[in-house]
UniProtKB/Swiss-Prot annotation:
Gene: Cpsf73
Gene3D superfamilies, per the entry: 3.40.50.10890, Ribonuclease Z/Hydroxyacylglutathione hydrolase-like
Organism: Drosophila melanogaster
UniProt keywords, alphabetically: Endonuclease, Hydrolase, Metal-binding, mRNA processing, Nuclease, Nucleus, RNA-binding, Zinc
Gene Ontology BP annotations: co-transcriptional mRNA 3'-end processing, cleavage and polyadenylation pathway; mRNA 3'-end processing by stem-loop binding and cleavage
Protein name per its UniProtKB record: Cleavage and polyadenylation specificity factor 73
Function of the protein: Component of the cleavage and polyadenylation specificity factor (CPSF) complex that plays a key role in pre-mRNA 3'-end formation, recognizing the AAUAAA signal sequence and interacting with poly(A) polymerase and other factors to bring about cleavage and poly(A) addition. Has endonuclease activity and functions as an mRNA 3'-end-processing endonuclease. Required for the cotranscriptional processing of 3'-ends of polyadenylated and histone pre-mRNA.
């Protein structure tokens, strides 16, 4: 198994090559989009945008693929860097495949992207899609339940809980027996409302996993929450405004639960308002209240008493026009990286006052304002181009529900995949993680895991060679076959599985039906049927069978010939063997007609009117079987023969023998007649 450096070879249906190519999230965080190609199937994993870019620049490198060739598209969760380009891809490209996500993801996807459209600080011409495109894309998205197994065009897949955010899923994908697990963003730590990512029950051959935090180790949840609430309390008690930039859905709900509980425990803070500032605030919370059953046991137990998402100390704020900035307060505003929208407006309004503070509570992508302020520059540039001093405090506490090094390593150890492909991580963090994992598993003799960290548009090529086996079914399976014996049937391939069936069983086990093609050939012929029999018998002794009742010949057991009005009509069922026999018969007849075989004398001798043949035949029969074996007088072409009380008849026109009483007698008569016939022909 190797890692390719180029893309010269592309996997097809019969190839053993599995190709994994990041079109986004390759040594970067943002615009997650991973392409899988194996056994002729093409699958896209996520279709996001880059938060630090805008317009077409924010898209994955989808110009390197043909959208109409993609069979399946899986969306892991509703964050913009994983689904932000989906409406554009579904509505503005030639994609004709099927798109899957969980129910909660689909419900939140609509509102998240609606908010993104409204707050995007770019011109209409640069917008990737409109509200109408977003609405239309909903009809093209199918939903899947957790642990529900699906089979589409031979690709089997199942969704598993990923933690991270509500509805986030890992996808286990199986193609031709090879299993690939795509984690998306996941967290192995349970928080206040979400379950931890589960470990799928089967081992994948390939694990495609995020590497956002590289080798970092997260602080304990309790310590993180205490540090967060202490910072918020410090800012508001000194008379400042506390800004917490978040995305409308995801970590926002976790932080709201923490703040509401902390305010309840501290009566001295009750006069200080907390605002959840998002145009989608009410809609978002309605979605969370709907999908309570997708959350952890703590929330499900609490809902029996009261809904934890009906907050006592938090108010919704639709926009800055509805906000009276008259004193200390806490505002959670979107978007999380402050590229535009309400969080950007509030930051620019408050950044000059040292009493105020901003708490960055999630991962920040390079090129965003949130990432820039973490380095605490002396001044910032507003959206209008104005320079403002940065006097407010800046703190970073990671509530981002991504795995740290310990969680990632433990997850790999539990699954024991053969290959691990790292995506969704900055180049340096990803490289450090790869080296750390290699060192850890090199020392473990019980595992042999290979690690990869491809850049965007660079493919990882893996080869999986397996034996192809066919399952014998139907009437073929009912036969008692010995070891080493040969079986003949129709090999049926379906969903990368092979079955061997008798042709008659096709309709029972498949959607196919069997058809028979009968070939018919007409050839000019100037002689009789008996002459034709004599001619064809020269191809091979015993290859000609006379069907007296139908006045036709059967050659090689598969080709039937009749002579009608100086035309030979030849019929056979088309198979590769029968066609060869038919060619031989046709060549023999054509050679005779063209003068290559002299049978004119034979034609005269075999006519029923020829008295010499009759006389010779009667004399021969009497010498062989006795004088009384044939009557002294008879009429027509049928000569009756009686031997030891058993009756037979010889057709003097076709030379066919009929004897129902004794097959041995029939064969003896046939030999006598044929030898006499050949002797008379040879004498001419």
């Amino acid at each position: 198994m190797t890692q390719a450096t180029g893309d010269a070879r592309m996997p097809d249906e019969e190839s053993d090559l599995l190709q994994i190519k990041p079109l986004g999230a390759g040594q970067e965080v943002g615009r997650s989009c991973i392409m899988l190609e194996f056994k002729g199937k093409k699958i896209m994993l996520d279709c996001g945008i880059h938060p630090g870019l805008s317009g077409m620049d924010a898209l994955p490198y989808v110009d390197l693929i043909e959208a109409d060739e993609i069979d399946l598209l899986f969306i892991s969760h509703f964050h913009l860097d994983h689904c932000g380009a989906l409406p554009w891809f579904l509505m503005k490209t030639s994609f004709k495949g099927r798109c899957f996500m969980t129910h909660a993801t689909k419900a939140i996807y609509r509102w998240m992207l609606s908010d993104y459209i409204k707050i995007s600080n770019i011109s209409t011409e640069q917008m990737l899609y409109t509200e109408a495109d977003l609405e239309a894309s909903m009809e093209k998205i199918e939903t899947i339940n957790f642990h529900e197994e699906r089979d589409v065009m031979g690709v089997r897949f199942c969704a598993y809980i990923a933690g991270h955010v509500l509805g986030a899923a890992m996808f286990m994908i199986e193609i031709a027996g090879i299993k690939i697990l795509y984690t998306g963003d996941f967290s192995r730590q349970e928080d206040r409302h979400l379950m931890a990512a589960e470990v799928p029950p089967m081992k994948p051959d390939v694990l495609i996993t995020e590497s956002t935090y590289g080798t970092h180790i997260h602080e304990k949840r309790e310590d993180r929450e205490n540090r967060f609430t202490s910072l918020v309390q410090k800012i508001v008690q000194q008379g400042g405004r506390c800004l917490i930039p978040v995305f409308a859905l995801g970590r926002a709900q976790e932080l709201l639960l923490i703040l509401d509980e902390f305010w309840s425990q501290n009566p001295d803070l009750h006069e200080i308002p907390i605002y959840y500032a998002s145009s989608l605030a009410k809609k978002c919370m309605a979605v969370y209240q709907t999908y309570i059953n997708a959350m952890n046991d703590r929330i499900r137990r609490q809902i029996a008493v009261n809904n934890p998402f009906v907050f006592r100390h938090i108010s919704n704020l639709k926009g800055i026009d509805h906000f009276e900035d008259i004193g200390p307060c806490v505002i959670m505003a979107s978007p999380g990286m402050m590229q535009s929208g309400l969080s950007r407006e509030l930051f620019e309004s408050w950044c000059t006052d040292p009493k105020n503070g901003v708490i960055i509570a999630g991962y920040c992508v390079e090129g965003t304002l949130a990432k820039a302020v973490l380095s605490e520059p002396e001044e910032i540039t507003t959206l209008s181009g104005q320079k403002l001093p940065l006097n407010m405090s800046v703190d970073y506490i990671s509530f981002s529900a991504h795995t740290d090094y310990q969680q990632t390593s433990e997850f790999i150890r539990l699954l024991k995949p053969t290959h691990v492909v790292l995506v969704h991580g900055e180049q340096n963090e990803m490289s450090r993680l790869k080296l750390a994992l290699q060192r850890e598993y090199e020392a473990d003799a019980s595992t042999d895991i290979k690690f990869y960290n491809p850049r965007n548009t660079h493919a990882v090529d893996l080869y999986f060679r397996g034996e192809k086996t066919a399952k014998v079914m139907g009437s073929l399976a009912a036969k008692n076959s010995e070891v080493g014996s040969k079986l003949s049937g129709v090999l049926v391939k379906r969903d990368f599985k092979y079955h061997l069936l008798a042709p008659s069983d096709l309709g029972k086990y498949t959607d196919m039906s069997m058809s028979v093609v009968t070939q018919r050939q007409s050839i000019p012929w100037g002689s009789s049927l008996s002459t034709l029999e004599l001619l064809l018998d020269r191809i091979g002794a015993g290859c000609v069978e006379v069907l007296e009742a139908e006045r036709k010949l059967r050659v090689f057991g598969c080709i039937e010939l009749t002579v009608e009005q100086k035309i030979i009509v030849m019929e056979w069922q088309a198979t590769h063997v029968n066609d060869v026999y038919a060619d031989a018969v046709l060549a023999c007849i054509m050679q005779s007609e063209l003068g290559g075989t002299n049978l004119k004398g034979a034609t005269k001798q075999t006519k029923s009117e020829d008295s010499r043949f009759r006389e010779c035949l009667i004399e021969t029969l009497q010498d062989t079987f006795g004088d009384n074996c044939v009557p002294k007088m008879f009429e027509g072409d049928l000569l009756p023969v009686t031997v030891s009380g058993k009756r037979a008849e010889i057709n003097l026109e076709t030379l066919a023998i009929s004897c129902a009483e004794d097959d041995v007698l029939r064969q003896m008569l046939n030999t006598t007649v044929q030898k006499l016939h050949q002797t008379l022909v040879s004498a001419l």
